[in-house]
Amino acid sequence: MNSRQMYEKIKERLVAHRHWTFRFDAKQDAMRVEDRRTKKGVTISLPGVIAKWHEQKDEAVREVVYYVEETLKTMEEDAALSGNERNIYPVIRSASFPTETKEGIPLLFDDHTAETRIYYALDLGKTYRLIDERMLEKDKWSRERVKEIARFNVRSLPTPVKEDRVADNVFYFVNTNDGYDASRILNESFLAGMRARVEGTMAVAVPHQDVLIIADVRNDIGYDVLAQMTMSFFAGGRVPITALSFLYENGKLEPIFILGKKRRT
């Protein structure tokens, strides 16, 4: 299964929507679906879908089709911030993620690390919409108000962790699939609490939006395992973020480059 074949498979499931257009981007290895009426759409990273398809077959395709249908349906609606304060959250994206909508409207975002940015989203139940300047103007909200509410809300999310051990290293995973697993990297009290549990070096990874990995690295093998694990999650994610990991020291995140059994910062 290659990217062109996956594009055709997804398109076949969506072509009944007569107002939608489909475009295959070979350079970006992606698929773009847009609604002609609203000029809005969604971009799908095809390698992640293919990786899931090898494990889940048709279920992986159904998941993407559902995501596209719900997202474009939501874009037809007029979303408001006022009255939806509990549904505003930060989302983590790669540093190369667009800073404006397809219509040229600036998105609300902050720099996070050299590899990541923080965007802000209005949760709409089955999907969400990234908050842009036009939404702020419409509801007469300030950027600071959105950010404050989003940070408060992400701290209120539960942080259940699953644990795995490899060669004396401990790996913790937050994977609730609520769309904001990676966002929990912004919960400073949670990270501080995990730091207290870690016996070795603490590393953190957000390979895609639906997982947060915290590693208790106690030997060189731990760095190799973390690198392989992060790359695997990154390749299989519907919304990939970064294949790099971060050292967590004194409340700060610093990207680490893992080569063989050595690390470089």
UniProtKB/Swiss-Prot annotation:
Species assigned in the record: Geobacillus kaustophilus (strain HTA426)
Disulfide bonds: none
Chain coiled-coil ranges: none
Protein name as it appears in the record: UPF0354 protein GK2818
Pfam families membership: DUF1444
HAMAP family from the UniProt entry: UPF0354 (MF_01548)
Entry's family note: Belongs to the UPF0354 family.
